[in-house]
Amino acid sequence: MKFLEAILAALAVTGALARPQRTRTGEVEAALAKLGVEVTKIPQLSGPMNNGCQNACGSLSELYGSEKVIAENTPAYHNVTQSYWAAQQGEVRPSCIFVPSIEKEVSVLVLISQLTDCPFATKSGGHAAFPGASSSQGGITMLFRNLNEVTLNENKYAASIGPGNNWGQVYKALEPHGLAVVGGRLSSIGVGGLTTGGGISYYSNLYGWASDNVESFEVVSAETGDILTASETQHPDLYWALRGGGNNVGLVTKFNLYTIPSTLLRGTTRVFSADQSSKVLDAFFQVARNAHVDGNAQQYVIFGRTAGANMISAELTYTKDVSNPAIFEKYRSIPAISDTTSTRTLLEYCDGIGTSDRNGLRELFWNRSFKLNEDFANWAVEYFYSIAPRMDSVPGAMSGLVFQVITEPMLEKMSHAGGNALGLDASSGPIHLMHILSMWNSTSDDDTIYGFANDFFTTVTAEAKSRGLDNEFIYMNYASQFQDVISSYGAANKARLKEIAHKYDPRGVYQTLQPGYFKLTHAPVANPY
């Protein structure tokens, strides 16, 4: 299979990547000593390094015991590997799983990884759709679940949030205070990946993306293990890079997010027959073009196919408890098969959306962005439905073409506090963010699904270019393993990210020993399709 061959090639390349030089051993040992770890007293670190990851796992177990270092072939290990959203991630087998409970222990892992040449990955929510994104084959998977604080500062204008939280935990902790933060739209999504990748929220037309609502990050230095604060005034270049740059410049152990008032949301999943697509798109574009008029409205539309049938689902959310807001009037005029309109808290809303988002299936995300154009959008929907029957023979296959808009208010807020790494601004938009999501049962059908998504976007991108509507931006949180996300931020931003990464991590620890997810120079896996 093409996909399996590509994964094996990627693993081979990962193994061949230049590691941080062993001449740093003395510096790393000194950094560990500052953290209370005496290398000479740990047999796995002071003796021969015959198997780097066995040495690393053994040394962590020596330091922290079996409660924090989960060994292979144990029930606890199985529970973790089966907790990923996508089955592809659950198939990855790390040498051990490390569960730190304080920031210092994260620093120790980063330093021990350098001594032993053992790669690692980190799991916040584990909601990526491909192997290695937050799991490390043969390396160490660091599970952040115990770094789960949610505390308010004295004036309650910011909340300190650990990367082990999912958004449901965050909203549950803040709602009794009448507060929320700009975060994910499903309760099960992890704080870490969503925020460093951008982070679209129900509140994004009002406040911007999650990454643009971070007061500061607390970040592990690969050089020393020190915890650095990255904010508009402290290490502002690092702060810029973490707002969209993913895991390339440091491990974040705490997100300090600005709080917002927690409101009741009025929302619905409104389902339409596929023959209403042009009317649905007319409503979609009307809401998108009026985001600056009423920022309380948020929407996405899924043009779906399952069990050989086409359908349309519009998720329409209003961040006030207002019946029939005027901005959604065109949607209400279209006959619906079903409508779930109700008033809920943010937590209830995110819990409800997540009920259909079950773990353990094979998953795909793949996205691209375009200039907002209604004729092109209608063409893309017609094209999707014309080729979607290719997947009807795949057991359990469900696929959707998802439409969202990066609105003008969102783009305007991306310049806040020095801007972010995404390469977008108000002159870019509004931008039509288009992605395919798919789920299915068996590895034997991987090539069919991946090939379908690749072919769709190859054709759609060519059509967009012929119309002068292409926009190269790829959203990290919806990208496939075959996409080079960082290059889509533009040459200048890519160069700046590389410069900042070299400044804070000159030996490339976060590029080579943390090889998973979207790196500065390449896609996770070469596209075989």
Each language-model region and where it sits:
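Soluble FAD-dependent oxygen oxidases
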Residues: K2-F3, L8, G15-Y529
